[in-house]
Swiss-Prot record:
Record's keyword annotation contains Ribosomal protein: no
Taxonomic path: Eukaryota, Sar, Stramenopiles, Oomycota, Peronosporales
Motif RxLR-dEER, chain ranges: 48-66
Role summary: Effector that is involved in host plant infection. Contributes to virulence during the early infection stage, by inhibiting plant defense responses induced by both PAMP-triggered immunity (PTI) and effector-triggered immunity (ETI).
Domain text: The RxLR-dEER motif acts to carry the protein into the host cell cytoplasm through binding to cell surface phosphatidylinositol-3-phosphate.
Transmembrane segments: none
Protein name stated in the entry: RxLR effector protein CRE17
Native organism: Phytophthora infestans (strain T30-4) (Potato late blight agent)
Entry annotated with the keyword Flavoprotein: no
Sites carrying sugar chains: N79, N131
Position of the signal peptide: 1-23
Top-rank taxon, per record: Eukaryota
GO cellular component: extracellular region; host cell
Subcellular location: Secreted; Host cell
Annotated family: Belongs to the RxLR effector family.
Length: 137
């Protein structure tokens, strides 16, 4: 009986002393195909290869939620401003004169960040004017 325990102890000692048996030696290897992988929806002659998953940029859920919140708050603030302007009786011409002068070139006006606000207010004004017209007549 003692011989079995001695033999077992010797085998365990050999296993521990041998690094190849218990220690896991893993070498990471990159696999590179010898050809370009194409999407099944593209023709084989199309030079646009399919993008790898690692190269696609994705927002985290927190960043997406924060971005959505910032956009919705900006729109809510803009809609409140438009509502106040509309109730004060300001027309799109009044808003145009607030942001731009009559002597400005149309290219300069179109490149201004205020042009977007002016054009969105024009849409808001026309939509609400159409809805309010039958109430006031």
């Amino acid at each position: 009986m003692g011989g079995i325990y001695t033999a077992l102890l010797v085998v365990i000692t050999l296993f521990i002393g041998n690094d190849n048996i218990l220690a896991a030696h893993i070498e990471l290897q990159t696999i590179q195909p010898d050809h370009t992988t194409y999407s099944p929806f593209l023709r084989k002659t199309d030079p646009r290869p399919q993008r790898a998953f690692e190269n696609t940029a994705e927002l985290s859920a927190t960043s997406e939620e924060r971005q959505w919140y910032e956009i919705s708050m900006r729109r809510a603030k803009e809609n409140l401003t438009f509502y106040i302007w509309y109730k004060k009786g300001k027309t799109p011409q009044d808003i145009y004169l607030k942001f731009f002068t009559n002597s400005m070139d149309t290219i300069t006006v179109s490149k201004s960040p205020n042009f977007g606000t002016f054009s969105r207010y024009t849409e808001y004004y026309n939509k609400n004017k159409k809805n309010d017209s039958w109430f006031r007549s």
